[in-house]
Amino acid sequence: YFFPLFLVTIFLYKWLVKKTPSKNLPPSPPRLPIIGNLHQIGPDPQISLRDLAREYGPVMHLKFGSVPVLVVSSADGAREIFKTHDLVFADRPYSSVANRIFYNGRDMVFARYTEYWRQVKSTCVTQLLSVKRVQSFHNVREEEVALLLDNIENSKSKVINLSEMLIELTGNVVCRAALGSGYNVDSYKSLLLQIMDMLGYSRSIEDFFPSLGWVDWITGLKGKVEKAANGVDAFLEGVLKNHTNPSTSSANKDFVSILLEIQEADAGSSMDKECIKSLIWDMLGAGTETIATALEWTIGALIKSPDAMSKLQKEVREIGKGKSRIEEGDLVKMDYLKAVMKESMRLYFTAPLLVPREARQDVKFMGYDIKSGTQVLINAWAIARDPSSWDNPEEFRPERFLNSPIDYKGFNYEYIPFGAGRRGCPGIQFAISVNELVVANVVNKFNFELPDGKRLEEMDMTASTGITFHKKS
């Protein structure tokens, strides 16, 4: 008699304690049992979260399965994350797909915040992606842009698939910088596209229900990830095995050569074979598709905005007058080009939710109590379209950036296309150097029109979802 009563008492106590909020959490939309708020996230998560934020506020507390999620949709909230509490929110949440692809978290993008990550980040920033190193690849960029122009020239009487041409260009630029000669984007493009799709948000059941990881085997995701991971490893193993380039000058060394030299110089460093493989795949993945997608959005926006296209062509053609190709030295004079690139990155994010972060400890955030282990989503897309920060935010208007101090380097929190803080993208200079050169040369040499008599208002500037967002057409 007493034992069952004791069990009931314990159960009621735990139930009541669990039901009684002991923390001051941000506002939250109503949840369903087990799945939490997952049912409220549509195919375009950034739009779903923006719409929820309009009703519940720019700081929300959601549950994705069993995972607590802090969603931030304002510049003030982003400033708190990236500046005030950057170290607290410097971790990454577990991703079953990324963990398998990147050798149990040995890369830079998805790795947890540890001393290992700090060493790897320092190596990438100082040795691979410094301004000097990026400038050393200017010949690669100019050669690949020349090939792009030739390909468009040879196809100019036909309807062209610019998306395919852009991913080939960016892939070859990144590939030559990372791997050197002997490789091109076709060496890894199929694998890359598979993995980028699998890394898209909410693909894995295990990430939201850790005890249900077996479901990903049933759905086939685990099998696909295993096959892709084995393909990546075989490709990268071949790269390392065949990579000998002793005659290359130090100024023009590719990324693999640099990392192998670091490994040889310090056998006790973190730079082992799996680390090198992970970093190289980071560079190939983060560089190829994201840069191509940004270019696709920019050219699409210019075609849809004839006035902006006309102004840009006027600037580029005046500065490049008499030249068959725009050179990198010409770009510094092109203020409207830089404004176009900034405006395109404001409206059309390749990663609109940024890469998720995770709280490393309990923290007081904007008056709310956030527990350690809470995942953090920054809706950078919504922040960049916030009417409290931008006039007519839905309009493509490059003029807003002329004579404006706002930049993409992570210090203006209303505009964070590359993120900010410790986990901000270190490849900004690499990406911008490709983007500006391509756009300047393409609009200098060609005029564009939509196929089959399509009207501008029929042009689809919405997105399809993966880890990066592409135009649907």
From Swiss-Prot:
It is a single-pass membrane protein. GO terms for molecular function: heme binding; iron ion binding; psoralen synthase (NADPH) activity. Residues 350-355 are annotated as: Substrate specificity. Heme binds at residue 425. It catalyses: (7S)-marmesin + reduced [NADPH--hemoprotein reductase] + O2 = psoralen + acetone + oxidized [NADPH--hemoprotein reductase] + 2 H2O + H(+). InterPro entries: Cyt_P450, Cyt_P450_CS, Cyt_P450_E_grp-I, Cyt_P450_sf. Keywords: Endoplasmic reticulum, Heme, Iron, Membrane, Metal-binding, Microsome, Monooxygenase, Oxidoreductase, Transmembrane, Transmembrane helix. Pfam families: p450. The keyword ATP-binding does not apply. One of its GO terms (biological process) is coumarin biosynthetic process. The keyword Chloroplast does not apply. Its EC number is 1.14.14.141. Its cofactor is heme. Optimum pH is 7.5. Pathway: Secondary metabolite biosynthesis. GO terms for cellular component: endoplasmic reticulum; membrane. Induction: Accumulates in roots after wounding. Psoralen possesses photocarcinogen properties. It intercalates in double-stranded DNA and cross-links pyrimidine bases under UV-A irradiation. Psoralen is widely used in combination with UV-A radiation to treat a variety of skin disorders like psoriasis or eczema. Involved in the biosynthesis of coumarins and furanocoumarins (FCs), natural products required for defense responses against attacks by predators with potential medical and agroindustrial usages such as anticoagulant, rodenticide and artificial vanilla substitutes. Involved in linear furanocumarin (psoralen) biosynthesis. Converts marmesin to psoralen and, with much lower affinity, 5-hydroxymarmesin to bergaptol. Belongs to the cytochrome P450 family. This is Psoralen synthase. It comes from Pastinaca sativa. The lineage of its organism: Eukaryota, Viridiplantae, Streptophyta, Embryophyta, Tracheophyta.
